[in-house]
Amino acid sequence: MGAAGSKLEKALGDQFPEGERYFGFENFGNTCYCNSVLQALYFCVPFREQLLEYYTSNKSVADAEENLMTCLADLFSQISSQKKKTGVIAPKRFVQRLKKQNELFRSYMHQDAHEFLNYLLNEVVDILEKEAKATKTEHETSSSSSPEKIANGLKVPQANGVVHKEPIVTWVHNIFQGILTNETRCLRCETVTARDETFLDLSLDIEQNSSITSCLKNFSSTETLHAEDKFFCDKCCSLQEAQKRMKIKKPPHILVIHLKRFKYIEQLGRYKKLSYRVVFPLELKLSNTVEPYADVEYSLFAVVVHVGSGPNHGHYVSLVKSHNHWLFFDDENVEMIEESAVQTFFGSSQEYSSNTDHGYILFYESLGPTK
């Protein structure tokens, strides 16, 4: 990779970003699903910064227990502290830990990059929550052995001994979490019932010759609940016809969109890859949001691409935008690409096409406030 590395340095020349590192990852037998997602996360700057901060504050703890997050922090630190600007790194410790922890990733079979991303983010959240709880328990034990709180110098007994626990919000939530609101309107009494739910990514159904904007509109389209799908209205105290729609109540800072390219075909009894052409813009305006976030804008910075004609075989690569340059990561290989090359990964407008490189997971960063 020395030649390829020097080629990349030559291509960037004096435009090589100060302090940045572009390293390919070694493949340990079908670990491209992991490599492509890790590259996208490394170039998700807020995620990288938090992880490096975590590494710095934890490396002094001699008896720190190894977990997936410490292995990931170690890998990111290894990349960022390289003396060389380009090269190849073997994420061996991380991959070994992943396989040890989850049997799903143990085989040499083709794995799903979206499943891996989901698992990784949820695992990091679990680790951070456990650590936050342990710190809180330690703090509470040392600060007070009495179950009573002190307010203005007076002891205030807790109501019936009930402690209201606030949910722990980690930095992963601050970066990736958004809130969806599910609105259901009873067609008899017009009462609107709203139910909120959080998300770390949005999985969108796709159609041929469509765009992310139209997929998002479909995601938020109004659905009528009738016949056996009637809605139980609390006000009418009975099953009623209703209209239901999903909107984004709070958009995340980093919006991750998963395109549902693998569809189960009943007649075939198996999954099929949808190679549909779905345009994903470099700048995205969200229109299915609730005030005050109307028309919040996002900029694309990474794409995980699935290469291949079927769901059970193929390859994953990633496209990453770093300091206004677009880079193509294919395991050990890293090269510079033109921004216009991104559109070659939209998909195919014909059913059968020689182009099998399709955008699968998209990473967008908010250009405005989402807090």
UniProtKB/Swiss-Prot annotation:
Return the broad EC class.
hydrolase
What does the record give as the active site?
Answer: C32 (nucleophile), H315 (proton acceptor)
What EC number(s) are associated with this protein in UniProt? Answer: 3.4.19.12
Instruction: Please state every residue range assigned to the domain named USP.
Output: 23-367
Motif (Bipartite nuclear localization signal) on chain:
83-100
One CC-aspect GO term? nucleus
Q: Which domain of life is it from?
A: Eukaryota
What's this protein's function? Recognizes and hydrolyzes the peptide bond at the C-terminal Gly of ubiquitin. Involved in the processing of poly-ubiquitin precursors as well as that of ubiquitinated proteins. Required for the correct development of pollen.
Into which family does the record put it?
Belongs to the peptidase C19 family.
- What protein does this entry describe? Ubiquitin carboxyl-terminal hydrolase 3
Q: What is the lineage of its organism?
A: Eukaryota, Viridiplantae, Streptophyta, Embryophyta, Tracheophyta
What gene is it encoded by?
Answer: UBP3
